[in-house]
Amino acid sequence: IDMQDTNKYKVYKAITAVGKWLLFAIVSFLILFPVLWIFVSSITPPGELFKMPIDYIPDHPTLESYKFLIENVGLLEKIGNTVLIVGVTIVVSTVICAMAAYGFSRFRTKGISIAFAFIIATMLIPEVVTARPLYDFMRAVGLYDTYPGLIILYISAVIPFTVLILKNFASEIPISLEEAATIDGANFVQRLFKVVLPLMKPAIATVCIINFITCLNNFFTPLYYSNNIQVLSVAIVQLPLRDNMYGVPWDLVSAMGWIILLPIIIFVAVFEKQIMDGIMAGGVKA
């Protein structure tokens, strides 16, 4: 009987392992196939895109789509705009939110708790709800279609999540470390910059990475609040048609989509551990 039970357990374990790997393979295929197909479409000549039967590997791969984007769509300018706006957003939002997170984690009064709750609650408000009032406000104060205006909107979009993660992480830092620094003669600023912030580096790195991805994927803000300042996320809907070509230029759409996806894929692949560790550490305590 013991031998039979052992054999049954081995069979069950083998079936479970096969099932897990099969499920993993199916999910991976469903996720990766569209990404790979975008890349294949981007290097496929327009005349071969809709050829039947479908060629999953193009007969005549070409980089003409990327060349066309660089020469005719101002791709380098869009990349520059994206780097400027996203870079300033990450730096400014991280500094502001790190200061705010420290205050929320250390000064526990009713008013501060209410302010924190209001900030987090804004994560639940859809962008379309505030679109028209913000649009009118941006035009009234002269910030519509300007770099400062877009940067302010980008910063406001990432503040709630950043404050939440950093505040929860800061709450886990023992106050005794600051008390020891105070005994050694450190003032408030020294405690903040020499004790607390260095310990928050994992969480700060995490929110910087996630905010980079969030800003890079932000489609609504640059589309609605800007006309002349173009970034990568909206470039895909502003692609011109080639000469004597009607309909959607799918090869250009695929090339632009791949250009947008590539830095995100690289960032997630390189910083996967930091992202997960930071989120887990920042989500321990609300």
For each predicted feature, which ranges?
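Short, Lys/Arg-enriched N-terminal segments with co-localized hydrophobic residues
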Residues: I1-D2
